[in-house]
A protein has these predicted regions:
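Long, contiguous internal "core" modules enriched in hydrophobic/ aromatic residues
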Residues: 3-331
Length: 331
């Protein structure tokens, strides 16, 4: 039977054309750790301590570490064998992996503070304005919102989290309403669910009141929390954050001196588009975390991590002297 082509439809200047890519069967075998090391050595990677490399590959995995080898390989157009740039050492790959891990953890630390703040601000406004069980009233949502679906989700989460002490207390002590007050409800929703609730379903006047706390307009705030949820999921699943092109571009505020990063963003590699890289998200995180905690030192910890490493800032969409921008409030 002939191999069926995979059809891709592209739009070009108002016309559509079809490109056929021939699909093939995956035939690569699984490799032992020793074979993985041998393959990298064959491609030119220096292994000063194979036993050390073996230990890391056993607990991190060849596939995960492979993503960190790409910057150290000869450019793809001239390199079908994934050959390493001469002089590349396994320690280079490992150090980049460790740096990326530290960066992810630093990002998660800030997002956790922002997320807790967002939960609290949403609950405080909605509960004080419409009552503790505001989310049970369909009138508090836009007409297009599937209110029944929200209640089904909360009901499902109550079953899943029934061993939580605060859920047990409510269900044992109260029979009406069936659902707990919103300060409990917002704690059992995931950040993604809470983001969807706020961004798509609350009335505009409520979105405006919630975003006022963070000193930005609702469209920008709602775009930012969606972007934070996106990058949070990347970090929480231990995926690479350095040298990543972001799938979701956040909406940008009007530039006001020292309250937002300077434009245009200029990086050392002209092929890189900063708007789709991490730097914008780091700026968003820094802005929001300082609304939650005015005395936060998160930006200083970011400075220490970035400036004590040797890895490309351009691959994060970051200017070489990013810290000189007044937005970062760094000496």
């Amino acid at each position: 039977m002939p191999v069926m082509p995979l059809l891709r439809t592209h739009k070009l200047t108002g016309l559509f054309f079809v490109k056929a890519d021939i699909m093939e069967s995956y035939t690569k075998p699984a490799l032992t750790v020793a074979e993985q090391i041998a393959q990298w050595e064959k491609r030119g990677l220096i292994m000063p301590d194979p036993d050390r490399a073996k230990r890391y590959l056993e607990v991190i995995s060849y596939y995960r570490l492979s993503a960190y080898t790409l910057p150290y390989q000869i450019p793809k157009s001239n390199n079908n064998e994934h050959t390493f740039i001469p002089g590349t050492n396994f320690t280079d790959i490992l150090n980049l992996y460790i740096f990326d891990r530290k960066l992810r953890l630093l990002i998660l630390d800030a997002i956790e503070r922002i997320e807790v703040g967002v939960r609290s601000i949403i609950n405080n406004h909605m509960a004080l304005t419409y009552g503790p069980h505001w989310y049970l009233d369909q009138n508090n949502f836009r007409n297009k919102y599937d209110h029944k679906r929200l209640l089904e989700k909360v009901s499902e989460l109550l079953r899943q989290k029934r061993k939580e002490v605060f859920i047990q207390h409510y269900l044992k002590k109260y029979d009406k309403p069936k659902f707990p007050p919103s300060w409990m409800m917002v704690e059992i929703l995931s950040f993604g669910q809470l983001t969807l609730l706020c961004a798509n379903n609350l009335h505009k006047q409520d979105q405006r009141k919630i975003s006022q706390f963070f000193k930005i307009y609702p469209p920008v705030f709602l775009s930012w929390i969606r972007s934070l949820n996106y990058v949070r999921n990347i970090c929480a699943h231990h995926s690479r954050i350095w040298n990543r092109e972001m799938a979701q571009a956040p909406q940008l505020p009007k530039v006001i001196k020292d309250t937002w990063i300077s434009y245009p963003i200029v990086v050392s590699d002209p092929k890189i588009k900063p708007e789709s890289r991490l730097y914008l998200l780091l700026a968003i995180i820094n802005f929001l975390v300082h609304q939650v905690n005015r005395s936060s030192s998160w930006h200083k910890r970011l400075y220490d991590l970035i400036e004590n490493s040797t890895f490309s800032k351009a691959h994060m969409g970051m200017p070489e002297n990013w810290f000189e921008d007044g937005f970062w409030r760094l000496p």
